[in-house]
Amino acid sequence: MKNNRILAGIAAGVIMVLTLVGCSGNRTGGAEPGTEPVEGSRVGVAMPTQQSERWIADGANVKASLEELGYVVDLQYANDDIPTQVQQIENMITSGARALVIASIDGTTLTDVLQQAKDQNIPVIAYDRLINGTENVDYYTTFDNYEVGVQQATSLLTGLGVLDENGEETGEEGPFNVELFAGSPDDNNANFFWDGAMDTLKPYMDSGVITVPSGQTSFEQAAILRWLPETAQERMENILTVIGDTELDGVLSPYDGLSIGIISALTSGGYSADALPVITGQDAEVGSVKSIIAGEQYSTIFKDTRALGDQAVTMVDSVLKGEEVEVNDTETYDNTVKVVPAYLLESDIVTVDNYEELLVDSGYYTEDDLK
């Protein structure tokens, strides 16, 4: 009898240990959202690169806001290397992250690693760039990227004098020689920027008000892989060679980094800094804002990344607390597997006439930042 009691006790102990081990194994990544306190929970934040000041600022903003709410943040930058980003996300999962905020390098390459996140009940927030080809992305926060493209084209038309400051046609018929640049083909946003811009410019291209001397009018021809300024500079140099003595009146650029490369090519190619074509941009990076003030780049698009970061943090906090996550778009962002519920923010056109109001008065930059 005594031996039976001992054996029963040992068996019960073994069962308890196995049960605890089993529970521990199921909880490696994250608990079911809303079932545990969030104080001290770990959140992984994966950003694409530190080569752009906007991504450095985005990462810092998200990290600081999450920490204010009591989260422990693992912030990683992948230097625009896809395997590095995948490895970083895997490490976040195995280190016990309860949520992931991901600004992808290539939105089509994360299917396998996000399945790992799903297996651990880890919610995923796509940050500014849509993650494609997987059901395992829960929410998306970004700006209205089609509208950003519209704004870029509108500012180009305004700079050319085709539209006035109110967006009304002036009757100016040109023809204006314009070259077109697009973003990285592996960034889903680049297509939205391009579509918004081209839908705005096409009527003027069809009527002859705008001509493209190089003839390069497709997204594939205009795209700049990884948004690299040096690639944009090289393409602009090649275009100048192709078009010869034809003088350019404008360049549609979807990003400030590309704009800087384009300006370098133009000045090297014989354009003076005070007689450059109308050049657009995006992100209101310091270098481009200074260029706008100096009369070189004409415009940029200001996307307040503080608001974007705040929205991502709000989504993380809501989903981990088991609360309803606020979205304002459930139709636009189809990643080929699902329509990802999204929250879209608004953006603004910045020129020399309003940069102080939009960028300095709002506290985004100080006057010293722009000197």
Which role does the model predict for each range below?
Residues 2-5, 23-371:
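A residue-level marker of the well-folded mature domains of exported/periplasmic proteins
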Residues 5-15:
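Sec-dependent N-terminal signal peptides
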Residues 18-22:
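C-terminal motif of bacterial Sec signal peptides marking the signal peptidase cleavage site
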